Amino acid sequence: MLSLDQIPHHIRHGIVGSRLIQIRGRVTQVTGTLLKAVVPGVRIGELCYLRNPDNSLSLQAEVIGFAQHQALLIPLGEMYGISSNTEVSPTGTMHQVGVGEHLLGQVLDGLGQPFDGGHLPEPAAWYPVYQDAPAPMSRKLITTPLSLGIRVIDGLLTCGEGQRMGIFAAAGGGKSTLLASLIRSAEVDVTVLALIGERGREVREFIESDLGEEGLRKAVLVVATSDRPSMERAKAGFVATSIAEYFRDQGKRVLLLMDSVTRFARAQREIGLAAGEPPTRRGYPPSVFAALPRLMERAGQSSKGSITALYTVLVEGDDMTEPVADETRSILDGHIILSRKLAAANHYPAIDVLRSASRVMNQIVSKEHKTWAGDLRRLLAKYEEVELLLQIGEYQKGQDKEADQAIERMGAIRGWLCQGTHELSHFNETLNLLETLTQ
């Protein structure tokens, strides 16, 4: 009989790392979306198979915690068919997603599988869904502006390659239209878009009407609609980030868009409350505020490529102190505020420039660009200051030289701030127009 030392290394490694006895448990309790099962040896984050003895069920679930020697699991699909006879079989692995160039042009579900139920080619690699962010000292500094093709952003809220920004908007603020424009016009190699908690009707409409064949060609979509289980909606954000990380590791410039962080947080809230966590700020358990930086810090520069990320945040009643909005703004490198008032006036993109900011803009733009942007901001602020007086007929020309200048140029400024959804503006063209407006 061979000793372990006489077995070839690759076989020995497999034997040492494997479970020689198949472990099975059984469901002991089902409460809402949470399962409890006695399954020895499982780890948090590990996937398990749920099967009925008559093979009427085949479903995966993820271990999210433990309580009194029982594992707490959340299924990755619908719970119909689970019974007291359902067996729980650990897989010994965490959730991974298949990645590769074949994903370009594909629409995936929240778990990284084809949305239409089809089959994908053999992946180039498998990436874990949960990964650590790049070490702080290994990140390259953000030094290069990234042209997003939107004049108001490139000119006044310049985004750097590897920056993370939030797009804050109430319902109907025009964020979906802005995202579609960004996908078509951003000067990047690959775009990864996560649609989390969207209405099912809007998905195909967005792909065919807003995105179009041109936008889809260099994009990967990860979609988890509002009717999907909470675990799938929560995982969609991590799956999209893992796919973006693969393309970053190939040396590409990646644009990661997520719509929306609020619905991601709500899915995490459902999971946390089901696991028995105490509700804190407006009903959100502590795990939500731990998940947000764990997700967002994975974007950014690495030694190989970059992920520039824009996350949309639904703001309830324009309340920027709402917990998810407040926490997200503190994590990210800038914020773009969309105004319902501007959207109602058919001013698109409906960006409120004076309430928006890019935290890295001053580090990456030229001195002239910084001056022109500052001058235009001053004109916008001055016009806002005297707008009410203009509306009631109380402003007299000549009272304030800077106000006169702002009023005189406001038509041209608004024309520059507005941009059609299919209109592309190159970075240098944007700067030339910005210079003209402020001279």
UniProtKB/Swiss-Prot annotation:
<dbReference type="Pfam" id="PF18269">
    <property type="entry name" value="T3SS_ATPase_C"/>
</dbReference>
<keyword id="KW-0067">ATP-binding</keyword>
<comment type="subunit">
    <text>The core secretion machinery of the T3SS is composed of approximately 20 different proteins, including cytoplasmic components, a base, an export apparatus and a needle. This subunit is part of the cytosolic complex. Forms homohexamers.</text>
</comment>
<dbReference type="Pfam" id="PF00006">
    <property type="entry name" value="ATP-synt_ab"/>
</dbReference>
<dbReference type="InterPro" id="IPR004100">
    <property type="entry name" value="ATPase_F1/V1/A1_a/bsu_N"/>
</dbReference>
<dbReference type="GO" id="GO:0046961">
    <property type="term" value="F:proton-transporting ATPase activity, rotational mechanism"/>
</dbReference>
<dbReference type="InterPro" id="IPR040627">
    <property type="entry name" value="T3SS_ATPase_C"/>
</dbReference>
<dbReference type="GO" id="GO:0016887">
    <property type="term" value="F:ATP hydrolysis activity"/>
</dbReference>
<dbReference type="InterPro" id="IPR020003">
    <property type="entry name" value="ATPase_a/bsu_AS"/>
</dbReference>
<dbReference type="InterPro" id="IPR003593">
    <property type="entry name" value="AAA+_ATPase"/>
</dbReference>
<keyword id="KW-0547">Nucleotide-binding</keyword>
<dbReference type="InterPro" id="IPR000194">
    <property type="entry name" value="ATPase_F1/V1/A1_a/bsu_nucl-bd"/>
</dbReference>
<keyword id="KW-0653">Protein transport</keyword>
<keyword id="KW-0813">Transport</keyword>
<keyword id="KW-0963">Cytoplasm</keyword>
<protein>
    <recommendedName>
        <fullName>Type 3 secretion system ATPase</fullName>
        <ecNumber>7.4.2.8</ecNumber>
    </recommendedName>
</protein>
<dbReference type="GO" id="GO:0005737">
    <property type="term" value="C:cytoplasm"/>
</dbReference>
<dbReference type="InterPro" id="IPR013380">
    <property type="entry name" value="ATPase_T3SS_SctN"/>
</dbReference>
<comment type="function">
    <text>ATPase component of the type III secretion system (T3SS), also called injectisome, which is used to inject bacterial effector proteins into eukaryotic host cells. Acts as a molecular motor to provide the energy that is required for the export of proteins. Required for type III secretion apparatus (T3SA) formation, proper protein secretion, host cell invasion and virulence. May play a critical role in T3SS substrate recognition, disassembly of the effector/chaperone complex and unfolding of the effector in an ATP-dependent manner prior to secretion.</text>
</comment>
<dbReference type="GO" id="GO:0015986">
    <property type="term" value="P:proton motive force-driven ATP synthesis"/>
</dbReference>
<keyword id="KW-1278">Translocase</keyword>
<comment type="similarity">
    <text>Belongs to the ATPase alpha/beta chains family. T3SS ATPase subfamily.</text>
</comment>
<keyword id="KW-0843">Virulence</keyword>
<dbReference type="GO" id="GO:0008564">
    <property type="term" value="F:protein-exporting ATPase activity"/>
</dbReference>
<dbReference type="InterPro" id="IPR027417">
    <property type="entry name" value="P-loop_NTPase"/>
</dbReference>
<dbReference type="Pfam" id="PF02874">
    <property type="entry name" value="ATP-synt_ab_N"/>
</dbReference>
<dbReference type="GO" id="GO:0005524">
    <property type="term" value="F:ATP binding"/>
</dbReference>
<dbReference type="GO" id="GO:0030254">
    <property type="term" value="P:protein secretion by the type III secretion system"/>
</dbReference>
<dbReference type="InterPro" id="IPR005714">
    <property type="entry name" value="ATPase_T3SS_FliI/YscN"/>
</dbReference>
<dbReference type="GO" id="GO:0030257">
    <property type="term" value="C:type III protein secretion system complex"/>
</dbReference>
<keyword id="KW-0614">Plasmid</keyword>
<dbReference type="InterPro" id="IPR050053">
    <property type="entry name" value="ATPase_alpha/beta_chains"/>
</dbReference>
<feature type="binding site">
    <location>
        <begin position="172"/>
        <end position="177"/>
    </location>
    <ligand>
        <name>ATP</name>
    </ligand>
</feature>
